[in-house]
Amino acid sequence: MRPKANQNHKLKVLLVFLLATLILIFIVRSTLTSSQEHQTPQETRSTRCSGACNKLPRSLAQALIHYSTSVITPQQTLKEIAVSSRVLGKKSPCNFLVFGLGHDSLMWSSLNYGGRTVFLEEDEAWIKQIKRRFPMLESYHVTYDSKVNQADNLIEVGKGPECTAIGDPRYSMCQLALKGLPAEIYETGWDLIMVDAPTGYYDEAPGRMTAIYTAGMMARNRKQGGETDVFVHDVNREIEDKFSKAFLCEGYMKKQEGRLRHFIIPSYRDGSESESNRPFCP
């Protein structure tokens, strides 16, 4: 369904405001850094750098121009985007993993300026199209073996001990674990994970069952401890609703805004004595 024109306008205003705020913060930081520099033998080099150092990063400028002029708005609503952007505002620069590549990808990457934002996408042709427009975005192709019509069976499979055992998804015996991602995806400690893909609105589509499960397992298996903020979009649909509650856990859910749910999942690798006794869900 096409969004209402008024909603599109409000969303565009929010995106431009967020990016403009980010740019203002960047400029203020750059100015403060420059003003605090002392005279040293490297004065000449610092002076030569000042213009380039204070220059607006190309990625931010491109994002601001794109969302100011584009007639296409992201799929999430203004209020939904605000939930994730508030968390990014506190944690960025950070490691941000996004299942899905779309019209909002440049926004997420820009809001995490200075951090690493990675997109996992099922459609190779779409990846190529986006890369032509925004080559600075880091994205990888993902193949999903699951189908929406298998969801009922998979949620039962997920209750078994092979799926509730905490470990690296690459070596998991659980049918829900995604095993074919690039090695660095498993080896990175992700601060935020957004599940807004793959396609899940018809029976033969891959659905988000494995993406949701794997996001939760990556958060629990995070080696350096800490917590991971996990977001799931389209929870108005049955699969996103059931699988997020089952594998990200209602006890870890912090907020729901519209079709977006926000979970905060602790690492189960914190080195404490209770680590091995911690239940899959609280």
Swiss-Prot record:
Predominant location: Golgi
Tissue/organ expression: Expressed in rosette leaves, stems, flowers and siliques.
UniProt record, GO biological process: methylation; xylan biosynthetic process; xylan metabolic process
UniProt superkingdom: Eukaryota
Positions of transmembrane segments: 13-33
Top class in the EC scheme: transferase
GO MF term list: glucuronoxylan 4-O-methyltransferase activity
Topology of the protein relative to the lipid bilayer: Single-pass membrane protein
Pfam families the UniProt entry points to: IRX15_IRX15L_GXM
Localization of this protein: Golgi apparatus membrane
EC assignment: 2.1.1.112
InterPro entries, per database record: IRX15/GXM/AGM (IPR006514)
Keywords of this entry: Golgi apparatus, Membrane, Methyltransferase, S-adenosyl-L-methionine, Transferase, Transmembrane, Transmembrane helix
Catalytic activity: glucuronoxylan D-glucuronate + n S-adenosyl-L-methionine = glucuronoxylan 4-O-methyl-D-glucuronate + n S-adenosyl-L-homocysteine + n H(+)
Cellular-component GO terms for this entry: Golgi apparatus; Golgi membrane
Knockout consequences: No visible phenotype, due to redundancy with GXM2 and GXM3.
NCBIfam families referenced in this protein's UniProt entry, alphabetically: A_thal_3515
Function according to Swiss-Prot or TrEMBL: Methyltransferase catalyzing 4-O-methylation of glucuronic acid side chains on xylan.
PANTHER family: OS11G0490100 PROTEIN (PTHR31444)
Family: Belongs to the methyltransferase superfamily.
Official protein name in the record: Glucuronoxylan 4-O-methyltransferase 1
